[in-house]
UniProtKB/Swiss-Prot annotation:
Membrane topology reported for the UniProt record: Multi-pass membrane protein
Disulphide-bridged cysteine pairs: none
Similarity comment: Belongs to the CbiQ family.
Matching InterPro entries: ABC/ECF_trnsptr_transmembrane
Keywords: Cell membrane, Membrane, Transmembrane, Transmembrane helix
Pfam family, one: CbiQ
Statement: the UniProt record of this protein carries the keyword Transmembrane helix: yes
Organism encoding this protein: Mycoplasma pneumoniae (strain ATCC 29342 / M129 / Subtype 1) (Mycoplasmoides pneumoniae)
Name assigned to this protein: Uncharacterized protein MG181 homolog
GO annotations of cellular component type: plasma membrane
Annotated TM spans: 27-47, 64-84, 244-264, 289-309, 387-407
CDD domains, A to Z: EcfT (cd16914)
Length: 434
């Protein structure tokens, strides 16, 4: 049964095996935290590459890695199916050079716009570090598979809230017609919107057609907000690149967890795991918590899982040789067949637990007494270096994530996952009335 779950301790002479057990546990926990934090596609991919490199540096069998990938392939398909029908919005990105937010003004005959920069990402602390500039943004579609440039869709533009905008501008006497104050003609405002050049990059999709734009005009006493949004004519079967990436994004999280857990359990013996957990939970001793009991329980549980799964495979083979069919039949037939597996497994689990308890008792194990260790674990410069580098990486990634750094110039689909670009566009489209 070549599954990652049955990977026991694999003795090898590598620096990963020689790391202090507490160091390995701390590094594992830091990366687990990073996996659960929404750090984005790029940073998560870096962790995935790191986990893969560590796996092979530890000289673990390649079949463990392949079985890990096979085990979550079904999960990826399930997530893809769910995202297919729940994420039909491909996301969008409006370029700075081609689109401007506007303040309406009247030049005597026509209603025009003052040009105001739509998309200014220089507010980001890391704009210079990652070279966020307009020139690169306008060329984004040429270097990035994730975008496609739409045709001009001004003929399909919808404008909502235009009546309230006209009423507000007229009531404040903001504009003059031929030297005199008059009411604002909403048709001129509408015409100015429709004449305004709008271009947008959409995430790629299959089965949906781009229909145009919606300009939503929100009016208050002090501000008038113009929000430009694309809208699509999508069918129930539209598949967006965003759905594929989101499915892969979540699946990658689980795969990273599997690889890291495999490295931890395959490079640490039961004694090392118990020692590392006990040292890691040492502060709880101040609260009179039996840390050594918890540590031994966790270590034994980790080691019991592989043995139980091996036993389950043996039972399946034995029952199949007796003519029991676990593969054919409807759902209820298969459930009844599984009873012949569950009952022996429970019996074996209790038997193994009893044998282990007797063996520990015969060796004089007493959880209430202080225990010594045969092997002395010491933290050397390798452990310190590995822990410091991991901690620095952890701090940098969290800091960049909090600041909202993304990698548009690298052609990544970061904006599909975080939505930060979309939020920034909508914020930039909010302008005060003249």
């Amino acid at each position: 049964m070549d599954s990652f779950f049955i990977n026991g301790y694999v003795p090898r002479d590598t620096f990963i095996h020689r790391l202090h057990p507490t160091t390995k546990l701390l590094i594992f926990l830091l990366f687990v935290i990073l996996v659960f934090v929404p750090i984005g596609f790029v940073f998560q991919s870096v962790i995935f590459v790191f986990a893969t490199v560590i796996f092979f540096v530890a000289k673990l069998p390649g079949r463990f890695y392949l079985s890990s990938i096979k085990s979550i392939s079904l999960l990826f398909l399930l997530l893809l199916f769910v995202n297919w029908f729940t994420f039909r919005d491909p996301g969008f990105y409006i370029t700075a050079d081609q689109v401007n937010t506007v303040k309406p003004h009247f030049n005597g005959n026509n209603f025009n716009f003052w040009n105001i920069s739509l998309f200014n990402y220089q507010d980001n602390v890391f704009s210079q570090v990652f070279n966020f500039n307009r020139a690169n943004m306008t060329e984004l579609n040429k270097i990035n598979f994730f975008f496609k440039e739409t045709a001009n869709a001004n003929a399909y533009t919808k404008v909502t809230g235009i009546d309230k905008l006209a009423e507000m501008l007229a009531s404040k006497n903001l504009f003059k017609f031929n030297g005199s104050t008059n009411g604002i003609d909403k048709n001129k405002i509408l015409g100015a919107f429709l004449d305004h050049k709008i271009a947008v990059y959409l995430g790629r999709s299959w089965g949906g057609d781009f229909s145009g734009f919606v300009i939503d005009v929100s009016v208050s006493d002090k501000t008038s907000t113009f929000t430009i949004k694309p809208f699509l004519a999508n069918s129930n079967y539209v598949l967006t690149l965003r759905a594929i990436i989101l499915a892969f994004y979540v699946t990658q999280k689980i795969l990273i967890m599997i690889i890291l857990a495999t490295v931890l359990t395959s490079t640490s013996s039961s004694v090392e795991l118990a020692y590392g957990i006990e040292r890691l939970l040492w502060p709880l001793k101040l609260l009179r918590v039996p840390v050594n009991v918890f540590a031994m329980t966790i270590a034994i549980a980790i080691r019991f899982v592989p043995s139980l799964l091996l036993e389950s495979q043996r039972i399946l083979n034995a029952q199949a040789s007796r003519g029991l069919d676990f593969k054919n039949g409807n759902f209820f037939v298969k459930m009844r067949s599984l009873s012949s597996l569950v009952v022996p497994m429970i019996s074996i689990a209790f038997r193994n637990a009893g044998e282990l308890a007797s063996a520990m008792e015969a060796r004089g194990y007493d959880p209430t007494k202080k225990r010594t260790t045969y092997r002395k674990f010491k933290i050397d410069w390798v452990d310190a270096t590995a822990l410091i580098l991991t901690a620095l990486y952890f701090v940098v990634i969290i800091f960049l994530t909090v600041k909202g750094a993304v990698f548009l110039d690298l052609g990544t689909p970061e904006w599909l996952l975080t939505g930060k670009i979309k939020e920034q566009v909508e914020r930039s489209l909010s302008v005060k009335s003249a």
